[in-house]
């Protein structure tokens, strides 16, 4: 799901920043429309229209992540476009595709990877929420949301049925957030100074 959002958002963000003008305006307004919906509501709407399966849940979660990655990529691309080495490359006639692949994309890579690490934790939470509501993974497919939902009926007699997957979910999300912070410290050159 994160790969879908990362790929789609990176393509849209670089396209919007590189071409600018009307294309930039249209793509970013489309991203603003997607951003205007709460993530869980948009996921429920997409799951209701696509049907309940783990693949559809991945697609819905991926669509939710596209605007965030698009905005991040657009901002980094616009920053790179103002650099003198890129202006020099344009002046000597370097093609647009070479500029994107050799100059812009490597500079976008660091922030996008950090965002992806944090997005993994949110994707796990969204999938668990959808499965808890009965819209994500369906039994007997394993999902922490399904396990928490199953244990809900036995919470007074056997709280560990819901507590164990809840703690596993917490540890997974916490771990991905720590990983994202570590990657940011490693890949952000401004913090290394």
Predicted regions and their residues:
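Alpha-helical transmembrane segments of integral membrane proteins
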Residues: 1-193
